[in-house]
């Protein structure tokens, strides 16, 4: 068989496979998407400690967090401006963590690894107790 014949056969097979998959998809049971949780921590980090906190976050915390079951993402956000309403002036960073479920997040925070890495981030904050930590469910 020549190259043209092989190419036609491959394309025909691919087209048939795509057609079969499109027809079969509606018959398959639809799986409900997982509803994740998201945790927000409002942080007050003095300007003199920002670089240190960000180095710890990106260099220590993130590489450890990604290893844990249920982890989806973690972000550190620096507040630019308040567009509407009010917010505590000292809260200049927001830590954002997303996990597949609260149960898996609880496993992560109970781990020795979390006990080692979170206090390093936390130490850069001015407020070490009673800072806002808010948990949301995806709906």
Question: Where are the regions that the model predicts?
Answer:
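Short, glycine- and small/hydrophobic-rich beta-strand elements in well-ordered beta-sheets
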Residues: 29, 64-94, 135-136
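Cleaved targeting-peptide boundary
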Residues: 30-35
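Active-site-flanking beta-strand signature of metal-NTP-handling nucleotidyl enzymes
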Residues: 36-44, 95
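Short amphipathic alpha-helices within nucleic acid-binding modules
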Residues: 51, 102-110
